[in-house]
Amino acid sequence: MKIDGRPYRTIFPEADGDAVMVIDQTRLPFAFELKRLTNLDDAAVAIRTMVVRGAPLIGVTAAYGMALAMRQDASEAGIERASATLAATRPTAINLRWALDRMAAVLRRAPESAREALAFTEAAAIADEDVASCRAIGEHGAKILSEIAAKKDGPVNVLTHCNAGWLATVDWGTALAPIYVAHDAGVPVHVFVDETRPRNQGAALTAFELNAHGVPHTVIADNAGGHLMQHGQVDVCIVGSDRTTASGDVCNKIGTYLKALAATDNRIPFYAALPFSTIDWTLSDGVRDIPIEERDAREVTHLTGRTDDGAFATVAVVSPGSPVANPAFDVTPARLVTGIITERGVCDASEDGLAGLYPERRRAA
């Protein structure tokens, strides 16, 4: 995608190969800055502190983190150490584990002397595959939006939660990819953007993306979605996913489940958009089995923003001494999901639906 007319990916190696560059998402939407990753620890910290975030991008960053680690230690012990360090950064996104397993398998087949170069080649391949997958998700999802547009006057009103756009992937995004493809094809689209507390990833990141692409949108408070649905102002919901089970349960940013409940109650289609690397074929009960990351209470108790004079300030918003819980994700059961949009097409949120698109994955599970 483009920033000020210049194309960017969220992660890419420097031209001289000395470092891997990422967009520092903690600085958005008020500053666009690139950050250099030069070693394993840099990559791990970037994932843990959410300089990079979004399940697909976390996976690609982990792949490049493995490549950077091979510069210091390409031994079997080095592979194990790098994989363990990166795997410990964030527990919910399955793309992280998928990318690490793929990298380790490729590296172990090569002699130690060849592992550094091979690691960068494989990480680049994973990044390119992510771009292709997200573009395909966009094409399949745009057909849904086009069908809705053909049946109504005015724009298709899409509600989305958190950020599942190009900032969450290498390019294009998952939930936002259909919106970009449809918009570029001339389909009138308007997006309701949940602010997505506590980190405000919708207000800060999704709105930033949509602004940059020229897509009409409105930022709304997290609790406004149900009201809009009741009054016929939402045509479809599209969200991303950090882990989806083989049975179609969708784990996504906290608050997604509530949107799905409201959509079901108001007979509004609710889709999850995700690549194959987000599917965990080993799990069937997402509510029971998906580990949910518990993040720092300070994300809830404090807000950081830009003041009217251009300075940045962090302020407390919670009564001092009150206990805080901060689960980062929730699970939407498959029964509430209209369909899953993947790079291979759209399917029912069910074991049979997913297996129909990925028969080889089901056999391999």
Curated annotation (Swiss-Prot):
Keywords: Amino-acid biosynthesis, Isomerase, Methionine biosynthesis
SUPFAM superfamilies: NagB/RpiA/CoA transferase-like
Entry binding sites for substrate: 53-55, 90, 201, 252-253
Pathway listed: Amino-acid biosynthesis; L-methionine biosynthesis via salvage pathway; L-methionine from S-methyl-5-thio-alpha-D-ribose 1-phosphate: step 1/6
InterPro entries in UniProt: IF-2B-related, IF-M1Pi, IF_2B-like_C, Initiation_fac_2B_a/b/d, M1Pi_N, NagB/RpiA_transferase-like
Annotated catalysed reactions: 5-(methylsulfanyl)-alpha-D-ribose 1-phosphate = 5-(methylsulfanyl)-D-ribulose 1-phosphate
GO molecular function: S-methyl-5-thioribose-1-phosphate isomerase activity
Record site feature (Transition state stabilizer), residues: 162
Coiled-coil regions, chain positions: none
Function in brief: Catalyzes the interconversion of methylthioribose-1-phosphate (MTR-1-P) into methylthioribulose-1-phosphate (MTRu-1-P).
Family as reported in the entry's similarity comment: Belongs to the eIF-2B alpha/beta/delta subunits family. MtnA subfamily.
Name of this protein: Methylthioribose-1-phosphate isomerase
Native organism: Methylorubrum extorquens (strain CM4 / NCIMB 13688)
